[in-house]
Amino acid sequence: MTAILERRESESLWGRFCNWITSTENRLYIGWFGVLMIPTLLTATSVFIIAFIAAPPVDIDGIREPVSGSLLYGNNIISGAIIPTSAAIGLHFYPIWEAASVDEWLYNGGPYELIVLHFLLGVACYMGREWELSFRLGMRPWIAVAYSAPVAAATAVFLIYPIGQGSFSDGMPLGISGTFNFMIVFQAEHNILMHPFHMLGVAGVFGGSLFSAMHGSLVTSSLIRETTENESANEGYRFGQEEETYNIVAAHGYFGRLIFQYASFNNSRSLHFFLAAWPVVGIWFTALGISTMAFNLNGFNFNQSVVDSQGRVINTWADIINRANLGMEVMHERNAHNFPLDLAAIDAPSING
């Protein structure tokens, strides 16, 4: 009898836990994805803060030349970063217990791998939590779909690219200057500016900014006046009101006359879908571009593609970009190799007579 009561009590505790986890009445929704999201993001955040402040230099290139990234080792907020895991580790799973000591783990950049893997798992669970809450509230799932764009971008630079290049040392450093370094080296090695998927991503980000600004300014300019001239127009809105807060007909007419009639949406739902879809699709393409360039399917190469009737090269902007790429690659990992791969690929002459 005692055993039966204990089992019922444990089932009751589990049931209460399940109801609490999945309740939409909580101030912050947890959900089953949140059960995994909370510890992974807390771990990633805690280790990032500690490592950014106090981590010792990391031998990123695996050539016994450590690179400093933390504040206590001479960096500031701009130059500081979590240095990627050493090339000596490659793609190996490198938890603390795999190192001979904590000092060795820190020297080989173990915190980077720990942070990145927990972060990616955490943001993926955050996306799942968005879907879970939408499902329980009877909403459509497009919030999680939109969030999949930055999740895909983060996965591309922190996981797919290192896998394609063969080492976590090629991942994006977790810092401002480190991000810029990653971008410059990526351009030097993959000519990303000449990749059509990157171009679509630029169109998505800048186009999304333009459309967001246009929409916000049109709505703000066509608000239905509910206040006097001495009051803020914002005071005329009450949360949850059934009436439209702006005149979509006036906004449609203005924009149609400013550009042309069919440039303006006459359906508020299709308009907002477009505002969401444009940047999301653009960032999807950028993430896909990073993922293909990870395996060295690089941007277009139009170097020396224009010649005159005598066969002399007429330089184009593509040739200028190529020259810049070579210069950037020479400066990258300057002690690990002396020449860009493009130049070093030529067979050296024999010196044996």
Swiss-Prot record:
Question: What PTMs does it carry?
Answer: Tyr-161 forms a radical intermediate that is referred to as redox-active TyrZ, YZ or Y-Z.
Enzyme Commission numbers on file? 1.10.3.9
Which InterPro entries does the UniProt record give? Answer: D1/D2, Photo_II_D1/D2_sf, Photo_RC_L/M, Photo_RC_L/M_CS, PSII_D1
Oxidoreductase among the record's keywords?
Answer: yes
> Its catalytic activity?
2 a plastoquinone + 4 hnu + 2 H2O = 2 a plastoquinol + O2
Annotated residues for binding of chlorophyll a PD1: H198
Q: Where in the cell is it found?
A: Plastid, Chloroplast thylakoid membrane
Question: What does the UniProt keyword field contain?
Answer: Acetylation, Calcium, Chlorophyll, Chloroplast, Chromophore, Electron transport, Herbicide resistance, Iron, Magnesium, Manganese, Membrane, Metal-binding, Oxidoreductase, Phosphoprotein, Photosynthesis, Photosystem II, Plastid, Thylakoid, Transmembrane, Transmembrane helix, Transport
Membrane topology is: Multi-pass membrane protein
Which parts of the sequence bind a quinone?
Answer: H215, S264, F265
Question: Cofactor: bound how, per the entry note?
Answer: The D1/D2 heterodimer binds P680, chlorophylls that are the primary electron donor of PSII, and subsequent electron acceptors. It shares a non-heme iron and each subunit binds pheophytin, quinone, additional chlorophylls, carotenoids and lipids. D1 provides most of the ligands for the Mn4-Ca-O5 cluster of the oxygen-evolving complex (OEC). There is also a Cl(-1) ion associated with D1 and D2, which is required for oxygen evolution. The PSII complex binds additional chlorophylls, carotenoids and specific lipids.
The cross-references to Pfam families, in alphabetical order and at most eight, read: Photo_RC
Q: Where is this site: Tyrosine radical intermediate?
A: Y161
Report the SS bond pairs. none
Q: How does it assemble?
A: PSII is composed of 1 copy each of membrane proteins PsbA, PsbB, PsbC, PsbD, PsbE, PsbF, PsbH, PsbI, PsbJ, PsbK, PsbL, PsbM, PsbT, PsbX, PsbY, PsbZ, Psb30/Ycf12, at least 3 peripheral proteins of the oxygen-evolving complex and a large number of cofactors. It forms dimeric complexes.
What is the additional note? 2 of the reaction center chlorophylls (ChlD1 and ChlD2) are entirely coordinated by water. Herbicides such as atrazine, BNT, diuron or ioxynil bind in the Q(B) binding site and block subsequent electron transfer.
Regarding protein family, the annotation reads: Belongs to the reaction center PufL/M/PsbA/D family.
> What HAMAP family does the database record attribute to this sequence?
PSII_PsbA_D1 (MF_01379)
The task this protein performs is described as: Photosystem II (PSII) is a light-driven water:plastoquinone oxidoreductase that uses light energy to abstract electrons from H(2)O, generating O(2) and a proton gradient subsequently used for ATP formation. It consists of a core antenna complex that captures photons, and an electron transfer chain that converts photonic excitation into a charge separation. The D1/D2 (PsbA/PsbD) reaction center heterodimer binds P680, the primary electron donor of PSII as well as several subsequent electron acceptors.
Which PANTHER family does the protein's record reference? PHOTOSYSTEM II D2 PROTEIN, PHOTOSYSTEM II PROTEIN D1
Q: What is this protein called?
A: Photosystem II protein D1
Species of origin reads Glycine max
